[in-house]
Design a protein with these regions (language model features):
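A short, surface-exposed beta-strand/turn
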Residues: 2-12, 20, 156-178
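Sec-exported extracytoplasmic/periplasmic mature domains
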Residues: 52-56, 68-72, 110-121
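Short, well-ordered alpha-helical segments enriched in acidic and aromatic residues
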Residues: 58-86
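Surface-exposed, charged secondary-structure patches
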Residues: 1-8, 87-159
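Short, low-complexity N-terminal intrinsically disordered segments enriched in polar/charged residues
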Residues: 11-57, 61, 65
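A solvent-exposed, charged loop/short amphipathic helix patch at secondary-structure junctions
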Residues: 29-34, 81-97
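Short, solvent-exposed aromatic-acidic interface loops
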Residues: 16-27, 148-151, 180-199
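Hydrophobic residues on conserved beta-strands that form the core of alpha/beta folds
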Residues: 13-15, 124-126, 179
């Protein structure tokens, strides 16, 4: 892992975070199909890295500040159960079911606080990051990414999932951008990614 160091305009260190891997970072800066300038890409990537670190650091206060008060938040959990195989009716087979939940900002933050208090660690990795600008609102940006989540509670219970997150960021105030939408969908075999776009919300 590499570190990123953030500085204020006065040269004071304001943050030290683990970074996304260098290949992903350079790929995003080059731009691909998106219409974002390099400066804005750097700004968005900095906030995406900070956002990921807030989960790892179990920093509910920072997460609370980054979501707008009326944010649309859709979370999901993968529930695994054992059941008999439909083929032979005898052998055991793991079945997965996804449970979605639409939450207000306060519900989401309260649930995170409870999770953080009861968890020994939370590991979150972001990859396959894609940036896009809203078609009609130049201050809104969509970020699609793959998220791998792993956590372990103090009682030993573990949870892990692999899915896609879409974030709709409002950069009207570039020093304090707000997330208006956060959605999660599970990664399916053969799936390339989430197809959400800023104009969907």
């Amino acid at each position: 892992k590499e570190l990123t160091i953030s500085f204020s305009r006065d040269g004071v260190i304001t943050g030290v975070r683990t970074a996304i891997d260098n290949n992903s970072y350079l790929s995003i800066l080059r731009g691909g199909k998106s219409n974002l300038d390099t400066r804005m890409r750097r700004e968005i990537l900095k906030f995406v890295e900070d956002f990921r670190s807030y989960y790892v650091e179990k920093n509910a206060t920072a997460l609370e500040e980054i979501f707008s008060d009326d944010a649309l938040i859709i979370t999901g959990r993968v529930i695994k159960t054992m059941g008999k195989s439909q083929t032979d009716g005898i052998s055991q087979q793991v079945r997965e079911r996804v449970v979605y939940s639409k939450q207000s900002k306060q519900q989401y933050i309260n649930n995170l606080k409870a999770l953080f208090r009861s968890s020994e660690f939370v590991n979150v990795d972001f990859s396959d990051i894609e940036l896009m600008r809203h078609g009609s609102n130049p201050n809104f940006y969509g970020v699609r990414l793959r998220q791998k989540w792993a956590s372990q509670r103090y009682n030993g219970n573990q949870y892990a999932d692999d899915g896609y997150v879409f974030l709709l960021w409002d950069f009207t105030d570039e020093t304090q951008p707000k997330i208006h939408v956060r959605t999660w969908t599970p990664r399916r075999s053969g799936q390339e990614g989430d197809h959400s776009a800023p104009e969907d919300f």
